[in-house]
């Protein structure tokens, strides 16, 4: 079991499965998290900016997760801008209310992954559909 920043205990791949379900079948009234772009291909050393837009004000209750192939999701950023322990300082989160960004200042080969935002402001907690980052 893994503890997320939103206080939910989940099996390793449950977070991604729930993200997909909420994205596809979100109930009326749920906060929708929309990520863009859906995918991008960058060269090592380039600056990357991922965006996440909430359908209503979530203050700064947004987290960012990284999921590498065949691995469980890892928390990168919580509270919109707080870097989780051990996360390299090239990862920076910003934003408030409805508009949020995750920036990778100098992308590295090991950053190949899917990146998801999630909101913990209003139950049920919801997640974006993700951005797939590929390295050229």
Swiss-Prot record:
One of its GO terms (cellular component) is immunoglobulin complex. GO terms for biological process: adaptive immune response; immune response. PROSITE patterns: IG_LIKE (PS50835). Residues 118-126 are annotated as: Complementarity-determining-3. InterPro entries: Ig-like_dom (IPR007110), Ig-like_dom_sf (IPR036179), Ig-like_fold (IPR013783), Ig_sub (IPR003599), Ig_V-set (IPR013106), IgV_Light_Chain (IPR050150). Residues 53-63 are annotated as: Complementarity-determining-1. Keywords: Adaptive immunity, Immunity, Immunoglobulin, Signal. Residues 86-117 are annotated as: Framework-3. Residues 1-29 form the signal peptide. Residues 64-78 are annotated as: Framework-2. Residues 79-85 are annotated as: Complementarity-determining-2. CDD domains: IgV_L_kappa. Residues 30-52 are annotated as: Framework-1. Residues 127-136 are annotated as: Framework-4. This is Ig kappa chain V-V region MOPC 21. The lineage of its organism: Eukaryota, Metazoa, Chordata, Craniata, Vertebrata.
